[in-house]
């Protein structure tokens, strides 16, 4: 596949993120919308994807059958639910299609299965497709190397009332970045809730706090607190378009890869920072 006019399929086309993805693909000079997908029983089947996204007709009817559009796309972008994502991934592997996965809430077993499928097809899997968030993850590694051994580390995240998983995938990615830089296992040092008489803070733990309210698109802060000073690294998203544009960028990049497991660090070439 070439890096011009990559044909993209958008899963979950009727959702908030799906509509943003349709808009982002339409704005891209390197990609076109090849297919838009929804549930088989959805009333949106047959509706023009562009009309649904509020940008005018694109000539692409929303479909409830992935098999019916398998020849219409090169890369699938999926921001849905874990079970649906696993089915999309299996289909893409069988039909040699690349897939960009922005779904969160996967189990550890599902994450391992995604890595296994990537041996046969191209996969970009990231908790967050914002350029700023992925740069923040690299900054957190640097901060952890300098302050992490002595500082109390807390991660605070806030999202809209409709988000169904907590902590967010991005918050967990932040924790993994920090723990990895410190040689720690996040599964052993994470503290996800505090209530009642908790006692003093456990040394070398990484705490998480979650807010769900209103229409907050996404806010994440990592705090490195020492006695007398603290460093806070924060990212705030004001529009889902930042995630959608990043996902389209990832899809265009993935079109040049035959197979393999990648994340936004690879897409943005942040390895050298």
Curated annotation (Swiss-Prot):
Record-listed NADP(+) binding positions: 39
Compartments reported by the entry: Cytoplasm
GO CC term (a single one): cytosol
Reaction(s) this enzyme catalyzes, per UniProt: (S)-2,3,4,5-tetrahydrodipicolinate + NAD(+) + H2O = (2S,4S)-4-hydroxy-2,3,4,5-tetrahydrodipicolinate + NADH + H(+); (S)-2,3,4,5-tetrahydrodipicolinate + NADP(+) + H2O = (2S,4S)-4-hydroxy-2,3,4,5-tetrahydrodipicolinate + NADPH + H(+)
Gene3D superfamilies documented for this protein: Dihydrodipicolinate Reductase, domain 2, NAD(P)-binding Rossmann-like Domain
Protein name: 4-hydroxy-tetrahydrodipicolinate reductase
Disulphide bridges: none
Binding residues annotated for NAD(+), in chain numbering: 12-17, 102-104, 126-129
Pathway: Amino-acid biosynthesis; L-lysine biosynthesis via DAP pathway; (S)-tetrahydrodipicolinate from L-aspartate: step 4/4
Cited function: Catalyzes the conversion of 4-hydroxy-tetrahydrodipicolinate (HTPA) to tetrahydrodipicolinate.
This protein's UniProt keywords: Amino-acid biosynthesis, Cytoplasm, Diaminopimelate biosynthesis, Lysine biosynthesis, NAD, NADP, Oxidoreductase
Superkingdom per UniProt: Bacteria
Source species taxonomy: Bacteria, Pseudomonadati, Pseudomonadota, Gammaproteobacteria, Enterobacterales
Subunit structure: Homotetramer.
Similarity-based family: Belongs to the DapB family.
Primary location group: cytoplasm
GO biological process: diaminopimelate biosynthetic process; lysine biosynthetic process via diaminopimelate
Catalytic residues as annotated in Swiss-Prot or TrEMBL: 159, 163
Amino acids binding (S)-2,3,4,5-tetrahydrodipicolinate: 160, 169-170
InterPro entries in UniProt: DapB_C (IPR022663), DapB_N (IPR000846), DapB_N_CS (IPR022664), DHDPR_bac (IPR023940), NAD(P)-bd_dom_sf (IPR036291)
EC number, as in UniProt: 1.17.1.8
CDD domains the record matches: DHDPR_N (cd02274)
GO MF term (any one): NADP binding
């Amino acid at each position: 596949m070439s890096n011009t006019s990559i044909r993209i399929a958008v899963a979950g086309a009727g959702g908030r993120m799906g509509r943003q993805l349709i808009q982002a693909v339409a704005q891209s000079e390197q990609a076109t919308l090849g297919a838009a997908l929804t549930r088989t029983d959805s009333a949106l089947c047959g509706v023009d994807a562009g009309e649904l996204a509020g940008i005018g007709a694109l000539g692409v009817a929303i479909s409830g059958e992935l098999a019916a559009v398998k020849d219409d796309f090169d890369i699938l972008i999926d921001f849905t639910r874990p079970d649906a994502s696993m089915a999309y991934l299996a289909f893409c592997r069988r039909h040699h299609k690349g897939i960009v996965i922005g779904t969160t809430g996967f189990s550890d077993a599902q994450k391992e299965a995604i890595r296994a499928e990537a041996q046969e097809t191209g996969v970009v899997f990231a908790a967050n497709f914002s350029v700023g968030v992925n740069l923040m993850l690299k900054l957190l590694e640097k901060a952890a190397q300098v302050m992490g051994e002595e500082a109390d580390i807390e991660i605070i995240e806030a999202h809209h009332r409709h988000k169904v998983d907590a902590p967010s995938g991005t918050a967990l990615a932040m924790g993994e970045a920090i723990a990895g830089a410190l040689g720690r296992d996040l599964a052993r040092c994470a503290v996800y809730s505090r209530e009642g008489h908790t006692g003093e803070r456990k040394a070398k733990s990484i705490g998480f706090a979650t807010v769900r309210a209103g229409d907050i698109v996404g806010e994440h802060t990592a705090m490195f607190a020492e006695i007398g000073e603290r460093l806070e690294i924060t990212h705030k998203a004001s529009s889902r378009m930042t995630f959608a544009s990043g996902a389209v960028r990832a899809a265009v990049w993935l079109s040049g890869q035959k197979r393999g497991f990648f994340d936004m660090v690879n897409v943005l070439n942040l390895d050298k920072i």
